[in-house]
C-alpha cells in the first residue's frame, strides 16, 4: 500500500475539464491527483521560416510553472531572464509528442501553439501536460474545421503519457512527487492510442535496472496510458470517434456528457485495472 492508499498498479484520480479558458481555441484543465495543469491551444496563420512555402503546418509548445506551484516559491523564469534546461526539455517533449499524431500537411501553413501552465505540482507535470494538451489540441483543430478552413480533422491517433517507477523495490504507476523523490528507477512513457511508443524517458536514479524490470515498467505504464486514452475519448464524445485510431478497451469510467465546462473523471483503479 502506498502513502496515499493506492495499490502499485493504481493511478491517481484524473479529471479533464474542457473549454476551461474562454479565449483560447482549445483549452483544458487536467487534474492528476493534486497535480493541476492548464493547457491551451492557439492557432496562428503562419509557420516558422523553415516551413514557409511547403504547405505544411507546425505544432510547438511552451511549459511553465507558477511560482507557488511547488512547496516553496520558485522565481519566475522571466524574472531570471532565461528559461531553465528542464523547462526547455519538457516543452520540446510536448511539442514533438503532439506532432507525432497530427497530419501536418492537412493542417496547412498554420502553427498550433500549446501552452502548458502548471498551477499546482505533485509529480507527473510533463505527462499530465501531454495528456491534457492533446484534448485542447483536438478541440482547436475541430474549430478550424468548423470554420471551413480545413476539410477534415487531421488527428491520426490518440496520445497520452504517464509515469512509472520502482519505489521501495516495487514497480508503481503514476508517481507523486514524494514517490518520485524516492524512486530507484524513474520512467515516463508517451504512447498512442494504438499502442505505438512515441517516447520513453527512463533513468536508474539510484541503481541500474534490468531488461526484465524495464519490460515490467513499460507494461505497467501502457496500462495507465490506455486508461488515460479511454478517458480522453469519453471526454471528447462524438468528436473523439473521428480520431484515426479508436481504443476499444473498456475504460470503466463513469459517463458524463461532455460539453462546455464539463469534466470527466477517472477514479483510481477504475475498471478493475
Curated annotation (Swiss-Prot):
Keywords: Nucleotidyltransferase, RNA-binding, rRNA processing, Transferase, tRNA processing, tRNA-binding. Its EC number is 2.7.7.56. GO terms for molecular function: 3'-5'-RNA exonuclease activity; tRNA binding; tRNA nucleotidyltransferase activity. Phosphate binds at residues 86, 124-126. It comes from the Bacteria. The keyword Disulfide bond does not apply. InterPro entries: ExoRNase_PH_dom1 (IPR001247), ExoRNase_PH_dom2 (IPR015847), ExoRNase_PH_dom2_sf (IPR036345), PNPase/RNase_PH_dom_sf (IPR027408), Ribosomal_Su5_D2-typ_SF (IPR020568), RNase_PH (IPR050080), RNase_PH_bac-type (IPR002381), RNase_PH_CS (IPR018336). Residues 254-273 are annotated as: Disordered. GO terms for biological process: rRNA catabolic process; rRNA processing; tRNA processing. The keyword tRNA processing applies. It catalyses: tRNA(n+1) + phosphate = tRNA(n) + a ribonucleoside 5'-diphosphate. PANTHER family: EXOSOME COMPLEX COMPONENT, EXOSOME COMPLEX COMPONENT RRP41. Belongs to the RNase PH family. Phosphorolytic 3'-5' exoribonuclease that plays an important role in tRNA 3'-end maturation. Removes nucleotide residues following the 3'-CCA terminus of tRNAs; can also add nucleotides to the ends of RNA molecules by using nucleoside diphosphates as substrates, but this may not be physiologically important. Probably plays a role in initiation of 16S rRNA degradation (leading to ribosome degradation) during starvation. Homohexameric ring arranged as a trimer of dimers. This is Ribonuclease PH. The gene is rph.
